[in-house]
């Protein structure tokens, strides 16, 4: 699991790894253009510092909305008190599908 952490962080951010070792979030991130990738990195830094003001919760899944471009979303869950587990990424056009995928991944993670 890759970990992104700044000094004095409130949360430790980790990526969910599938059985084959791949990271759904990482694969999505690598396909972003440079501007979108920077926006996502800034959002992750804010999340790490405890700023979850742009988050809506759906069935235990957090959706961090980036108000820019296509409406980028980061889907995650809190695992324990201080770990944020990145499950997926997407945009407004795939929002419903992305939420269902994130919920399924979170369920599989919790009960495996």
Please describe what each predicted stretch is.
Residues 1-71, 80-84, 91-112:
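Basic, Lys/Arg-enriched alpha-helical interface segments
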């Amino acid at each position: 699991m890759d970990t992104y952490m700044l000094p004095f962080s409130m949360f430790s951010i980790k990526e969910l790894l599938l059985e084959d070792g791949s990271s759904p979030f990482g694969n999505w991130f690598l396909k972003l253009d440079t501007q979108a990738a920077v926006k996502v990195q800034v959002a992750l830094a804010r999340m790490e510092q405890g700023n979850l003001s742009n988050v809506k919760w759906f069935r235990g899944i957090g959706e961090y909305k980036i108000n820019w471009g296509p409406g980028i979303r980061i889907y995650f869950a809190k695992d324990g008190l201080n770990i944020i587990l990145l499950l997926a990424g997407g945009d407004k056009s795939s929002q419903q599908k992305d939420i269902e995928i994130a919920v399924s991944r979170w369920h599989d993670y919790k009960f495996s």
